[in-house]
Amino acid sequence: MLVSWAVPKGPSLDPKEKRLAMAVEDHPLDYARFEGVIPAGEYGGGTVMVWDIGTYDLEDDGSFDSAMRRGRLVFALHGRKLKGGWTLVRTGGRKWLLMKRKDRSASTADVTTNKPRSVLTRRLLAGIARDEGGDVARAATGDPSSIATG
């Protein structure tokens, strides 16, 4: 299973920024490579893009499960777009904060604006919606609240 969070404003490479990350339902491993449209009215309905892909390493002592119970995950990402140190801190219920740690991959550049394409197909959200029969106008806005968390 993929433990998953929705980050409505997308990740920030700026260590001064804190981004809301909402814990969502765990996803099957197959979802790591799913792009397409989930019909409106179904869970996660909307256009789904694989925006980044990679691996992670926990940087805390202890297991992933113990870090989840504590509500603090300290990890490094080794993705095509996101790299370096990150921290997720639970603030209550399903609400977490995602923060970039200060390291050589930190930046004030807006990574979601500068790198908007799928890492699998190089399509934009609107292109995925068009190709898969989804709502192109809604996907074209890039509004993260209109994007399924997959």
Q: Which stretches of residues belong to each language-model region?
A:
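Catalytic cores of nucleic-acid ligases and guanylyltransferases
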Residues: 1-150
